Amino acid sequence: MSIFYIADTHFGHENSIRFCNRPFADVNEMNRTLIKNWNAKVTPDDDVYVLGDFAYRRATSVRDIVRQLNGRKHLIIGNHDVSWMKNKEAVAEFHEVTPLLEIKDEERLVTLCHYPMMAWRNSKRSFSWLIHGHIHNNVQDEYWPLLTTMDRALNAGVDINDFMPVTFDELIKNNRKWKLRNS
């Protein structure tokens, strides 16, 4: 069993292609690629922590998308999840749904939240990490200089993680490259 992290898939959200400069011709290609990439990595026995903004609005298709994805899916609620979550059948496809969660990934204490945070439980300790989403690949906002100094705050957004779920070690590697490239 492995643990994977992913955020900001925005299934069904055409504008996310333009907003984030995603390399897809349309939303159908984006959805197909995200599903294909997910299932190429994740087995049915794996846990996938989705750090928010899973989908956009269309609740009936959300349930169908979740059913196509391998693994036990844990949803950390994001700002774009509120609309589709009115469909209880779609929500029921997730193993758990919560706005904030702490887990152990090997010897690490990991706080999971859709939004980046300045501090979290034991954030000054070397074993404590934050994994978040929400910011996509945005390096223009006022928080960016601060975020580049936070080595144990990791962005699980698909826009910097090759549009697929990633392991903790892959998150570290991808975030270091992203921060270095944009600092």
What positions do the PLM features span?
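Short amphipathic alpha-helices and their capping/turn segments at secondary-structure boundaries
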Residues: 1-2, 117
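Core catalytic region of metal-dependent phosphoesterases/phosphodiesterases
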Residues: 2-105
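Conserved beta-sheet core of the metallophosphoesterase superfamily
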Residues: 91-183
